[in-house]
Amino acid sequence: MKRELALEFARVTEAAALAAYKWVGRGKKEAADQAGVDAMRTMLNRLAIDGEIVIGEGEIDEAPMLYIGEKVGQIYNEEEKDSVTYVDPVDIAVDPVEGTRMTAQGQPNAITVLAVGKKGSFLKAPDMYMEKLIVGPEAKGKIDLSKPLEDNIHAVAKALNKELKDLMIVVLDKPRHKELIKDLQAMGIKVYALPDGDVAGSILTCMIDSDVDMLYGVGGAPEGVISAAVIRALGGDMQARLKLRSEVKGASLENDKISKFEKLRCEEQGLKVGEILKLEDLAKDDEIIFSATGITGGDLLEGVKRKGNIARTQTLVVRGLSKTIRYINSIHNLDFKDEKITHLVK
């Protein structure tokens, strides 16, 4: 995979962020998601890649999606395919708007993300729930999801040479985590309760200017695979296991029906619900490019700032082979954007 593609993928997430930004604070999360999807798809189809979406989103919440199995790249673009001379075959994991609710409500930490790897790089996880335990490089090799969470916390604290009162753990602020958050706080641990967006929370475990030491909890499997890609690129560690909807949301006719479908999907892909997945199972190669652009400002990235038709974005790009982290600050004149996305971002 040509390293020059890193900048091209940054342009993809920038476009998605600019498009989603138009819906910040308007209370319409589906519209924000659709805008991000449309911009991301348009930009991916301008690149010299033979890409396949292997991680998308939309089956759980019926959101607009770049669907799993969708082909993207210039060779699938009727207007440009005849001019293509070389393409990189790649698998792509996307979350066009991570934090649709936060975008709709004008809240911080909404981002747009994608991870790209060679064919076969990513676990093709069904769109279901996933339990995740994530740490940064200094605690790599110290986590084991088969052991109680408390044992893992003590192991990480020892690796980081910290007391429990100095640890900070990211947990999604969801009803399912209410008791978990209370238990962690009772141990003296600082809990950073994010309303949504565990990809951003995952990355914070690996950043040198972050106070976050660990992420734990249940979130989406698609986001889990994207997190694994960037965590591997950053040198951190992760373990996970797939969870049925009925395990997470409780038994009901609807949840049980969905859980049966999830089991079937797992069987079709050779996966077992509840089996521990290590980082290497989720992201199988170091040749990964990850890009994220802020929509609303947050702990990881600044959000889009716009004055008239001039906009500013901040993008994080990570290249797995070199472990290089880049922040790209861009100023966009929306009057001169690619004509294919002008109506989406302007």
Role assignments for model-derived ranges:
Residues 65-67, 104-107, 126-128, 179-185, ...:
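Short acidic, glycine/serine/threonine-rich loops at helix termini
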Residues 184-193, 198-204, 208-215:
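Glycine-rich ThDP/TPP pyrophosphate-binding loop and its adjacent helix/strand module
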Residues 53-57, 92-94, 103-105, 124-125, ...:
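General beta-strand structural signal in soluble alpha/beta enzymes
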Residues 1-93, 158, 199, 285-286, ...:
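N-terminal subdomain of lithium-sensitive/metallo-dependent phosphomonoesterases centered on the IMPase/IPPase/PAP
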Residues 5, 204-346:
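Oxyanion/phosphate-interacting regions
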